[in-house]
Amino acid sequence: MSSDHKSKFDLELNPFERSFATKESSSVSLNELAAASNNDAISDVNSVATSGSSINNGSSSNKHNLHIPNISSVNQQQGVNGKLPGITPPLFTPGGRRLPPIGLSPGGTTSRQYSNSTNSGSLQSNTDTLGSNIWGGLPTNQTFQPQPQPQPQPQQQQQPQQQQQTQQPHNFNQFMSGMRKTGLTPNESNIRSGLTPGGLTNFGFGSNLVPGLSTPGALLNGPITPGLSSLLGITQTPSSLLVPTTSSFSQNNQSHLIQPAANTSVGPIPESTALGPHVNIPQANQLQQDQSSQALVGGLPPSQPQPQPQPVIAQQIHTIPENQSIAFDMTQPAVANAHLPESKPDLSETANLQRDLNPTADTTTNTTTATKKRKNDTAGGTNKKAKVAKGKKKEPKSKSKGKNNQEDDQNASNKPEDENVPGKENGNEENHKVEAESKEEHLQNGNETTTTKTNNTGNSSNGTTTTTTTKSKSKKNSNVSEDDKRKNFLERNRVAASKCRQRKKLLIQKMEEELEFYSNGYRELSAEVNELRGAILLLKEKHNIQDEIIDGLLSKPTTVPTNVTSIPSTIPTTLNPT
């Protein structure tokens, strides 16, 4: 590989670079391209490559071997000179036609749609040439290689479908690497600014056209990483991302796992389970066991035909070690949930009940009641065992605990006899010991076994009755307390209402007294105001009279005598004799 062998996109000139190019080199390259287009108009890609290599030996600047089909029409429009203008118009590239917008640009379309939309007028495209096959050859699975060396296609002896899947990601990966090396990807404005933002969904290389893109092999070997594929919206198959060791482990252990039998009986299934969502044990199996045991002991027919539950073998359950099961649950929770064995009740109790059957008709009723009460006791003991052994997990409480009973019965059958049990399980162990002793004595005397069972069940029934009485007393106390609370509430309301009425009466009486007081004061004040008003009017009248007198006195003229004689000052005289 030398510097001459470059990608076809490396040496292509954009309109801005074409404006600075010399007219001689551009005219020579255009003429040579026109001659090449006239000679090789209907030739294939190989003939175009050879003609391009011969042109590279000359002094032209067309080193990218791009065969442009519409060069003749451009030369005819340019005239006899064969010279390009200084700056090309925005609608035309140096080749004489607008490049199709790449699909990675926003709003871009495929080359086939663009070439179909531009095949009108003087701009005619030849689909057999290289210029259209660069953009249109990728979706149609035509060989496009940015390097002139022929790439060997792997595994041609296999099926054509597999060959197509390996060829298309190879071409697409080389195309993407070429696009990343060069910043010359044209968009709608003919500005080659590198990869513009957009998804692969707009490019036309979706999973329908290129099925190899959805496989992890093409993504890991190519320039696109799985993280980038998740960003670009390429969906991978989840089965390809699984750990091979855990999948093979699940396949090997499928033979050791027991599939659950179809549940044909109708019964309510509680929402709360003993082990969470990993083990799904239907409650109807416990109901089937109860009904079958009653039918075997008391000779009563079952309520409905029920399928025989399958016993669980202890070796099949313990095939998976603890460390492998933990790793298996960590890696594949879905597979672990699907293939965990579902525990089923044993038929040991039913077999023991068949041994304990008494042929005499007198003890059948006693045995039926004894077995019913004993099952209640064992159910209570197993519930305590589940709470002690699994104290770390907080299990939701429910009314029906059939699932817990079934799982604990199976665990008890699988455990050895010498295993240490907490203090809460002592009652359960004593019940089992008494049952074993009663079985041995039953072989000697059948009536004694029934009496021992009735004694044991009598003690348990006494415990249950005491619990029920305490519950009933608590309910009564709660009811009595609620009635007392209601009575106290009503009494408080009554006292508060009476006090409110008394305060209201006092306020009304006070308001009446104040009203009377203020009304009397108003009347007295109004009378005094009237008296003062009369006095004021009298004073006004007197004042008016005085004013009139003063005005009258002042209005009289002064008369002076004309014959005035000199009078001595010591003698008083009247000046104005009347």
Curated annotation (Swiss-Prot):
Induction: Expression is induced by cell wall damage caused by caspofungin, and by osmotic stress through the HOG1 pathway. Expression is positively regulated by MNL1.
Ranges for region Disordered: 39-169, 176-195, 287-311, 342-489
Keywords, in A-Z order: DNA-binding, Nucleus, Phosphoprotein, Repressor, Stress response, Transcription, Transcription regulation
Record's comment on post-translational modification: Undergoes HOG1-dependent phosphorylation after osmotic stress.
GO biological processes: cellular response to copper ion; filamentous growth; filamentous growth of a population of unicellular organisms; negative regulation of filamentous growth of a population of unicellular organisms; negative regulation of transcription by RNA polymerase II; regulation of transcription by RNA polymerase II; stress-activated MAPK cascade
Disruption phenotype: Leads to caspofungin hypersensitivity and increases filamentation.
CDD domains, per database record: bZIP_ATF2
Residue stretches of biased makeup (Polar residues): 39-50, 70-80, 107-132, 184-193
Protein name: Transcriptional regulator SKO1
Span list, region Basic motif: 485-505
Cellular component, GO annotation: nucleus
Signal sequence extent: none
Entry superkingdom: Eukaryota
Reported function: Transcription repressor involved in cell wall damage response. Regulates 79 caspofungin-responsive genes, including several cell wall biogenesis genes such as CRH11, MNN2, and SKN1. Also controls the expression of pathogenesis and hyphal related genes and represses the yeast-to-hypha transition. Mediates the response to oxidative stress.
Originating organism: Candida albicans (strain SC5314 / ATCC MYA-2876) (Yeast)
Subcellular location: Nucleus
Domain called bZIP: residue spans: 483-546
SUPFAM superfamilies: Leucine zipper domain
Bias type Low complexity, positions: 51-62, 154-169, 287-296, 356-370, 445-471
Biased composition (Basic and acidic residues): 415-443
GO molecular function: DNA-binding transcription factor activity, RNA polymerase II-specific; RNA polymerase II cis-regulatory region sequence-specific DNA binding
Region Leucine-zipper: start-end pairs: 508-515
